[in-house]
Structures are given as C-alpha cells and as structure tokens.
C-alpha cells in the first residue's frame, strides 16, 4: 500500500486539528514548493529526510526491444532522491506492517 497526498492531508487533519481543506491546501503547497524549487534548478534539502537533486543525463545509445533497432536515448534532466542518514536508519530498523 502506498501513502497518497489525500492520506497525508487526512493524517494532518487528525493529528493537528486543522480543517480538512487547510490540511489538503498545506500538502499541496508543500509539494508545489518542492516542484517550483526543482524547476528553478535548486536542490531541495529536507533535514532528517533526504535531498532531491537534479542530474543531467547525456544522450546514450539504446535499442528498441521489439525490433532490435538501435535508437538514441536523448539527453535529459532527471530528479534524483538521496535519503538522509536518519531516514535510512529508521527504514532499516522498521518492522513492516502487513
């Protein structure tokens, strides 16, 4: 099961006592700020969680799996995430819920 933005908003509503609308707006504003920073070429550092970085990938050779034809994979910019030590440690020591 995956955590969704709607579930995040519901959790904020329950834990902080803010209205459901405010909780939803808060979650949306947070992710919009992350998106905007990345669009502007900025790294996003979330202390105790991890870093979102931008990485430029060069063009490289590829192959069409259906035809076997060689095709170039175009250069592009990608977002990467590197978890922080605290997050790594918590995940490593967590007991998965089933």
Swiss-Prot record:
> GO CC terms for this protein?
cytosol
**Entry-linked InterPro entries:** Hist_DNA-bd, Histone-like_DNA-bd_CS, IHF-like_DNA-bd_dom_sf, IHF_alpha
Superkingdom as given in the UniProt entry: Bacteria
Q: Tell me the keywords, alphabetical order.
A: DNA recombination, DNA-binding, Transcription, Transcription regulation, Translation regulation
- Residue ranges for the region (Disordered) are 50-71
Named from the GO MF annotations, one term is: DNA binding
GO biological process terms on file = DNA recombination; positive regulation of metabolic process; regulation of DNA-templated transcription; regulation of translation
- Write out the similarity annotation: Belongs to the bacterial histone-like protein family.
Protein purpose? This protein is one of the two subunits of integration host factor, a specific DNA-binding protein that functions in genetic recombination as well as in transcriptional and translational control.
Instruction: Supply the PANTHER family for this chain.
Output: DNA-BINDING PROTEIN HU, INTEGRATION HOST FACTOR SUBUNIT ALPHA
* Assembly, per entry: Heterodimer of an alpha and a beta chain.
The name under which this protein is listed is: Integration host factor subunit alpha
* Originating organism: Proteus mirabilis (strain HI4320)
